[in-house]
A protein has these predicted regions:
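C-terminal recognition in membrane/secretory proteostasis and scaffolding
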Residues: 2-42, 139, 172, 230-232, ...
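Serine-dependent protease modules
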Residues: 26-289, 338, 366-368, 376-381
Length: 382
């Protein structure tokens, strides 16, 4: 039986970052129908100055069969089930979800599980089930939605199996890969096999572009967060079923373990991704209603700046370009930020805006001429 989570971790740090939603180059237009569509990136972290986690080192042994690999690694993969409580019209509703995870480290009796952010996003209750059938209360330690990586911890006095992390940079196209996970949320421990089809695939996942491994290994909903292993029994990828089109056979994706490991280690040590840039702005999206043939086009404008925002931004600015890159969507905005490091000097072009009111409506009008300035990117999460 699942245990209800009675409380969150002892020290919870919630870091909220409002990102932009899309952009347009047109000016002197009235914005109307502003949408409630802010994009927030949240890290939740029981951050205590960096945990000392023990990992398993590799011995580079190549197994002769799939059965031998599965025997060596299957116990490192766990099932994750979640419950999310929502309230609507004074009533509470509980939604259930399921995915997979891989045990990758231990500190004392605390085991560290890597999974996808979308597996546990919004969950009020997390249950982890091992291959042997033991169930544990899971606590969310840290998460990053742009990397789609989350860390869940469990406490166990039993000795649990820990996956060996491989080197995804050394993968060869065509080599055999084995996926183990919980497809459909009810078939835990399912094993499928395929080959590595490609590396370095740039795949859009919602409002971000991720660099992923491509495989023809069968992956279904519930596999998310599970392990992708090579024939050495090394974890070389974290399965991402969210990017895998169920209508297209033989094309599935996973996060390279080298990328996931960097995110994992930074979240453990700092509580955020070291070097990731942000402007710390509260931004919304709206539609242009008039001017220069621009009616119906979408713009991004700043609804609020705060003491921690990057310098020189002003409320109601329409963000037009970042380091010369035109911002036409939230994807463009996040891509531009991903090309910047915290502490970098950045050139930004905006159109200054101001509130415009009439008898019938109110909105925001923008200057006819743009304003260009330089600012220094902030460290995301600080």
């Amino acid at each position: 039986m699942k245990e209800r989570i009675k409380k969150v971790l002892s020290i919870i740090i919630v870091l909220l970052l409002m990102f932009s939603l899309s952009g347009c180059s047109l000016v002197d237009d009235l914005v109307q129908g502003s949408e409630n569509s802010k994009n927030e990136t949240t890290n939740v972290c029981d951050y205590q100055g960096g945990s000392v986690v023990t990992y398993v080192s590799t011995d580079s042994k190549v197994y002769s069969s799939t059965a031998e690999v599965v025997k060596a690694v299957a116990d490192t993969v766990v099932e994750i089930t979640t419950e999310t409580v929502t309230t609507s019209w004074g009533r509470q509703y509980i939604a259930s979800g399921a995915g997979s995870g891989v045990i990758v480290g231990v500190s004392g009796n605390t085991y560290y599980i890597i999974t996808n952010n979308h597996v546990i996003s919004g969950a009020s209750d997390i249950t982890v089930r091992t291959r042997s059938g033991e169930e544990y209360k899971g606590n969310l330690l840290a998460t990053d939605d742009s990397a789609d990586i989350a860390i869940v911890i469990i406490t166990s006095t039993n000795e649990l199996s820990i996956a060996t992390m491989g080197n995804s940079d050394e993968l060869q196209i065509g080599e055999d890969l084995i996926a183990i996970g919980n497809p459909l949320g009810s078939l835990g421990g399912t094993v499928t096999k395929g080959i590595l089809s490609a590396t370095g695939r740039s795949i859009q996942v919602e409002n971000y572009v991720m660099t992923l491994l491509q495989t023809d290994t069968a992956i279904n909903p519930g596999n998310s967060g599970g392990g992708l292993f090579n024939m050495r029994g090394e974890l070389i990828g974290v399965v991402n079923a969210k990017t895998s089109d169920e209508e297209i056979e033989g094309i599935c994706f996973a996060i390279p373990i080298n990328n996931a490991k960097k995110v994992f280690n930074d979240l453990l040590e700092y509580g955020y991704i070291l070097g990731r840039a942000t402007f710390n702005l509260e931004i919304s999206v709206a539609t242009l209603s008039s001017g220069m043939g621009s009616s119906g086009k979408t713009v991004v404008y700043i609804t609020n700046v705060n003491d921690n925002s990057a310098d020189n931004f002003m409320q109601y600015d329409m963000i037009y370009k970042i380091n010369g890159m035109e911002i036409t969507s939230i994807l463009d905005y996040n891509t531009a930020l991903s090309m910047i490091k915290a502490g970098d000097e950045v050139e930004v072009e905006v159109y200054r805006g101001s509130v415009s009111q009439s008898f019938w409506s109110s909105g925001i009008s923008f200057d006819k001429e743009s304003t260009t300035f330089k600012t220094t990117a902030k460290q995301y999460g600080e």
